[in-house]
A protein has these predicted regions:
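A short, polar/proline- and glycine-enriched secondary-structure boundary/capping micro-motif
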Residues: 271-275
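Residue-level marker of positions within ordered structural domains that often coincide
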Residues: 8, 160, 254
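Positively charged n-region of N-terminal signal peptides that target proteins for export
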Residues: 1-4
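Low-complexity, Ser/Thr/Pro/Gly-rich disordered linker/stalk regions
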Residues: 26-231, 237-239, 276-298
Length: 298
């Protein structure tokens, strides 16, 4: 089923979001929240164990980022927990499948995401594009989560063997969040200028990439993480992925406005030693968590 080298695909299992039961009144810069800490918010996230789980694509998908065409209505899951990204559209295939070996003990269901035709439907560009699959957080909770509550998210992702990936270097998959801050925007009218506050949304996260390196004189493919983003908005290098199969990924957001990134092989809960990095992407101080989502890149 997965041996199509031009397809980017990944499985997701048990995506969850947590927050502290009460807002934290103070937190030092050195306090890093391990994803999986706090009270699990059962209104959002998914374990994909329901045998009736399904996704209604409502094709053709949105490509607003390319041609400003959303193609309403948006795709959505039948349980109301997931929806198509209005900016870039949903993966070509989103469906419930049997959990691959090595998943959480007792799990019977996972979500498969797979794309071959990213970009504008029926108009191949021969360029790299990405699809979005978004967890319905903000609407199901009735609002955003303030970073005073140290919200954090975890997911289990099955990374297929490298020989099953699309044969190109670069990003193939990502686990990201939509977060919000407040910025000052300069406005000019005639000869006068002014400043006003504006809500700004940005999307930090972990990308999974394919690369090649020299081993005994041969180019050998390998996988690694890149982190979005540093203070200037640039991605920076994360650790290599020494083994494929199941990985647990996590993001946390703390009252000091920082974003923290975690990953470990397997499906066990994240620990402090699984920490990758802390950043203030784009120089923005994070204020609220709106959602988390997956990218499939092709």
């Amino acid at each position: 089923m997965r041996k199509i080298h031009s397809v980017s695909c990944c499985f997701a299992l048990l995506s969850t979001i947590f927050a502290s039961a009460m807002p934290l009144l103070a937190q030092s810069r050195s306090d890093i929240v391990v994803p999986g800490t706090g009270v699990q918010l059962n209104q959002v996230g998914d374990d994909f164990e329901d045998e009736t789980w399904d996704f209604i694509p409502n094709n053709p998908k949105s490509t607003e980022d390319i041609d400003e065409n959303q193609r309403q209505p948006m795709g959505k899951s039948t349980n109301g927990r997931w929806y198509e990204g209005a900016k870039r559209g949903h993966p070509d295939i989103v469906k419930r499948v049997p959990t691959p070996p090595g998943g959480i003990p007792g799990s019977q269901g996972s979500m498969l995401m797979k794309s071959l035709y990213t970009g504008i439907p029926n108009r191949p560009s021969h360029k790299m594009h990405q699809d979005d699959f978004i967890c319905n957080v903000q609407y199901r909770l009735g609002g955003t989560l303030k970073v005073s509550q140290s919200p954090n998210v975890t997911t289990r992702v099955f990374i297929p063997p490298l020989e099953e990936w699309e044969n190109r270097n670069g990003p193939h998959f990502a686990f990201r969040a939509a977060v919000e801050t407040t910025i000052m925007e300069n406005k000019t009218k005639f000869l006068f200028s002014s400043k006003s506050q504006k809500d700004e949304v940005y999307w930090p996260g972990l990308f999974i990439l394919r690369g090649t390196k020299q081993v005994e004189g041969k180019n050998v493919p390998y996988a690694y993480f890149r982190v979005r983003a540093d203070r200037n908005g640039g991605d920076f290098l994360g650790p290599e992925i020494p083994v494929t199969g199941w990985w647990t990924l996590g993001l946390s957001f703390t009252p000091d406005g920082l974003v923290h990134y975690f990953a470990r092989p397997g499906v066990e809960e994240l620990r402090r030693e699984d920490y990758i990095a802390t950043s203030m992407p784009y120089g923005y101080r994070c204020e609220e968590l709106r959602s988390f989502f997956y990218n499939v890149v092709n």
